[in-house]
UniProtKB/Swiss-Prot annotation:
Endonuclease that specifically degrades the RNA of RNA-DNA hybrids. This is Ribonuclease H. The gene is rnhA. NCBIfam families: PRK00203.1 (NF001236). GO terms for cellular component: cytoplasm. Mg(2+) 1 binds at D10, E48, D70.
Amino acid sequence: MKKQVTIYTDGACSGNPGPGGWGALLMFGSITREVSGSSPATTNNRMELGAAIEALALLKEPCLVDLYSDSSYLVNAINNGWLQRWQRNSWQTAAKKSVENIDLWQKLIKLLKVHEVRFHKVKGHSDNAYNNRCDQLAREAIKKTS
């Protein structure tokens, strides 16, 4: 039986593009692990994707994951089938433009083959303590890039 893990993620950018950070909480039973990282020159969407990728990559075995994010870009790409369509259309959007962040989407796809992940949208900068903590971790990570 696969372990059930809950992950909250958030990405942030000071300027877009600009220095960015990401934060994540991984929860298994009574254990919570906080992780974060940064990049000196990036975009908010890259940090949102990066948070999910880095958190999933930390799991040491295939897991059942509920992943919560305030990123419509991330959650809608999965839940609305955009990611599958982009792949079928040779990484082109419905408007026939190149999909951005292909490198990160491809990393995420590999992780989604290992873990069974359900994506959930949460309202950002609201009353969700876990999302707010991830935002705080992301913003603290940005400060470390300066």
